Amino acid sequence: MKTIDQPTLSSFAPTGVLRVGINLGNPVLANEDPISKNLYGVTIDIANEIGKRISLPVQLIPFKSAGATVDAVKTGEIDLVFVAIDPVRGADISYTPAYIQIEGAYMVKVSSPLKTNDEVDAAGNEIVVGKGSAYDLYLTREIKNAALLRAASSQTVIDDFMSGTGNVAAGVKQQLESDAKRYPGLRMLPGRFMVINQAIGIPKARANYESTSAYLSNVIAELKQSGFVADAMKRHNIQGAKVADQ
């Protein structure tokens, strides 16, 4: 097990507490118990393991969307974030290799004439996305003809869609499948339009961010190889995702 030196640790967690941003907008990563408000999920397990390895207390700070967690890590409010790898965010955030891969999918109403993912990017189609999400950033780059309509978060995409916004909903496959149980008359287009690589991100503004990122990359490699990530996914009943390749 690789150890972390004091200058790197001081740069990584300058307050003496590891402040971790938890994205509740993606149920693959984390969830909140509606009664106790306790946070649980794969990212919570990884955060606590990192805290144990560096001998610091962990403060879990929940956010409703990936975009909000990214903003917080860029301003230095938090020390670490679990977020999708994206080149736009990469200007300010240093990533580890991915620990989980998630599929992005499209959902339409059963009456829709759309049958395949390739048909979505056409003039007249309107795709509802979660503002600032990994798939929003991806589709912003890739979609040429359809329009993108941004919901406040990934969790509200289907609510907006069912209230009459757009004719296609985009999101993490598991989130869409969960939402479809709340609303009748929806169907998923087969396959996926992207693979979302989830990683740990830290702010590049910190003095020793490169050595911190190297340390965390080693931790992630160990957690994948040892079965820690796979066990966490099984424990939290995560479907529609897989442990990222080594």
Q: Locations of the language-model features?
A:
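Short loop->beta-strand "edge-of-pocket" segments that line small-molecule binding or catalytic clefts
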Residues: 17-22, 40, 118-133, 147-148
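Flexible hinge/capping segments at coil-to-helix
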Residues: 97-99, 108-127, 210
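Ligand-binding cleft/hinge of the Venus flytrap
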Residues: 30-36, 47-57, 121-123, 132-153, ...
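Extracytoplasmic small-molecule ligand-binding "clamshell" domains
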Residues: 1-84, 89, 223-226, 235
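A ligand-binding cleft/hinge motif common to bilobed small-molecule-binding domains
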Residues: 67, 84-92, 138-141, 162-195
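Short helix-initiation/N-cap motifs at beta->coil->alpha
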Residues: 44, 59-71, 114-115, 149-163, ...
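Ligand-binding clefts/hinges and TM-proximal coupling segments of bilobed small-molecule sensing domains
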Residues: 1-3, 8, 134-151, 188-189, ...
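Periplasmic-binding protein-like
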Residues: 24, 101-108, 173, 177-220, ...
